[in-house]
Amino acid sequence: MEAPAAGLFLLLLLGTWAPAPGSASSEAPPLINEDVKRTVDLSSHLAKVTAEVVLAHLGGGSTSRATSFLLALEPELEARLAHLGVQVKGEDEEENNLEVRETKIKGKSGRFFTVKLPVALDPGAKISVIVETVYTHVLHPYPTQITQSEKQFVVFEGNHYFYSPYPTKTQTMRVKLASRNVESYTKLGNPTRSEDLLDYGPFRDVPAYSQDTFKVHYENNSPFLTITSMTRVIEVSHWGNIAVEENVDLKHTGAVLKGPFSRYDYQRQPDSGISSIRSFKTILPAAAQDVYYRDEIGNVSTSHLLILDDSVEMEIRPRFPLFGGWKTHYIVGYNLPSYEYLYNLGDQYALKMRFVDHVFDEQVIDSLTVKIILPEGAKNIEIDSPYEISRAPDELHYTYLDTFGRPVIVAYKKNLVEQHIQDIVVHYTFNKVLMLQEPLLVVAAFYILFFTVIIYVRLDFSITKDPAAEARMKVACITEQVLTLVNKRIGLYRHFDETVNRYKQSRDISTLNSGKKSLETEHKALTSEIALLQSRLKTEGSDLCDRVSEMQKLDAQVKELVLKSAVEAERLVAGKLKKDTYIENEKLISGKRQELVTKIDHILDAL
């Protein structure tokens, strides 16, 4: 029975194999998964799948050596892959991680990866490798809504078999759950259950690309905490400091809270809101200082900071516990000494920092944007990253004493987990002479300030003394006053005319006498002021003095006519003058008076 089975197995192998890029010959070496031990860790909100694979080169008449092999992802989970790593078993150093590159297989859909072997595999040889994959958002709450007092149950669907382009001789699967409370699970191969473990297999002679749905429904109250968006800003200064600030948007992606929230029950009953998140710990670099933690309202005083030998542990406690569907936003910032992360050789600089740092255990970051602000004048910027990242066009950042802006590297990546906490290296060139730019700008600014003050106190910025212009200004001012006084004097005449008209109607001689007295008094005062201004004009040597003198003579004649009109009115009232004669005389007086006023107006216009 052994020989026919082996022949059939080899036939399946040759029939399902597709050539891998980088093979030693045009015909792909026949490989087989001799033994696979899978561990599926579902104890958190991540699905961590670790497979210990014994890969064998069958030979089968082929003399070509295998320099690489293929990995395939399950179609149901491939879209949620966050991390894929392959390592030779027994070698724990990060430097011994095998090179993994995504590839395509003709005629096959899905995601495939080529893994380069450290040593070419001869026919009949074997190698043990460990394949580690981490998937996010594959544990779905069921029911999707729970009350504050209920526990959270989730459903996971995967594959009973190790999904591979190669046949597998034997394989087992161990599933680690978050609790012993299991509602249901698939029963393929009569699995054994012990506490929070499910053991499947062994499965023998499994063909390539085999699939059989594995499903488990169990209690999982671990924190389903997800960073939906995060912006990490790293500002580098050559004066000894690196400032780091992280803007974090958090969401509880577990079962949504149904019904009201009772803080009283939450504090009184230990199991109330068991799947909620009260606080979590963030690990900062050991050299972190000036740490701050705030949100939209302001500083959050419920946080705690613990300084350890190799790190700074920060307990972040939001203002309210996070239940399913609830969100929060906060900002964490700190400073680092640049000598621990910035290296240079002449004008060549290298910044070695983590692309993403620890935020909380079992972290998931849906979207991360990293902005690295380099000193002004940095050029020839290059980035070395341990994994693929995307870059947006570089930006410019302006701050104090900047002239043409600091270059900003903008990089982003989606779906990150703890395995992405690795260093990136930013290489750039910087002329050290530019370090003097800011001090020189400060010196120049103070120099200009002091020089301006010296000039200001030594120069006379008052209006230039021009005798002619000053005389003209004085004459204009005096003329303006003369015009005002003349207008007031003309107003007196009009007011006296109204008094005469009232006298003719009332025949009250006291009214007329009072009006005459008021006219004489005010006219005398105004005429005196005009005469004084006339003398000032004469002092200034202005030819306007003669015009004012002429206007004064004309005004005297106007006054005489005004008083004569009043006398005529008295004679009319006393019956000494006939009305016809009065009217005729009044016309003559008014005509002469109007002629004089017109002459005065012409003089005023000339002024």
Curated annotation (Swiss-Prot):
- Where, subcellularly, is it found? Endoplasmic reticulum membrane; Melanosome
Glycyl lysine isopeptide (Lys-Gly) (interchain with G-Cter in SUMO2) cross-link: located at: K538
The membrane-topology field of this record reads: Single-pass type I membrane protein
**Species this chain originates from:** Homo sapiens
Q: Which residues lie on this side of the membrane: Lumenal?
A: 24-438
The role this protein plays is:
Subunit of the oligosaccharyl transferase (OST) complex that catalyzes the initial transfer of a defined glycan (Glc(3)Man(9)GlcNAc(2) in eukaryotes) from the lipid carrier dolichol-pyrophosphate to an asparagine residue within an Asn-X-Ser/Thr consensus motif in nascent polypeptide chains, the first step in protein N-glycosylation. N-glycosylation occurs cotranslationally and the complex associates with the Sec61 complex at the channel-forming translocon complex that mediates protein translocation across the endoplasmic reticulum (ER). All subunits are required for a maximal enzyme activity.
Concerning its family, UniProt says:
Belongs to the OST1 family.
**Pathway(s) of this molecule:** Protein modification; protein glycosylation
Q: Which UniProt keywords apply?
A: Acetylation, Endoplasmic reticulum, Glycoprotein, Isopeptide bond, Membrane, Signal, Transmembrane, Transmembrane helix, Ubl conjugation
Q: Which residues cross the membrane?
A: 439-457
Official protein name in the record: Dolichyl-diphosphooligosaccharide--protein glycosyltransferase subunit 1
Q: Which residue positions carry a glycan here?
A: N299
Q: Which GO terms describe its cellular component?
A: cytosol; endoplasmic reticulum; endoplasmic reticulum membrane; melanosome; membrane; oligosaccharyltransferase complex; oligosaccharyltransferase complex A; oligosaccharyltransferase complex B
Question: What PTM annotation applies here?
Answer: Ubiquitinated by the ECS(ASB11) complex. Ubiquitinated by RNF128, leading to degradation in a proteasome/lysosome-dependent manner.
Q: Can you provide one Gene Ontology molecular function annotated for this UniProt record?
A: RNA binding
**Biological process annotations from GO:** protein N-linked glycosylation; protein N-linked glycosylation via asparagine
Coarse class of the primary localization is endoplasmic reticulum
Spell out the subunit comment.
Component of the oligosaccharyltransferase (OST) complex. OST exists in two different complex forms which contain common core subunits RPN1, RPN2, OST48, OST4, DAD1 and TMEM258, either STT3A or STT3B as catalytic subunits, and form-specific accessory subunits. STT3A complex assembly occurs through the formation of 3 subcomplexes. Subcomplex 1 contains RPN1 and TMEM258, subcomplex 2 contains the STT3A-specific subunits STT3A, DC2/OSTC, and KCP2 as well as the core subunit OST4, and subcomplex 3 contains RPN2, DAD1, and OST48.
UniProt key word Transmembrane: yes
Q: What's one Pfam family here? A: Ribophorin_I
Could you list which ranges are Cytoplasmic topological domains?
458-607
Give the InterPro entries listed for this entry.
Answer: Ribophorin_I
- Which tissues carry this protein? Expressed in all tissues tested.
Q: Where is the signal peptide?
A: 1-23
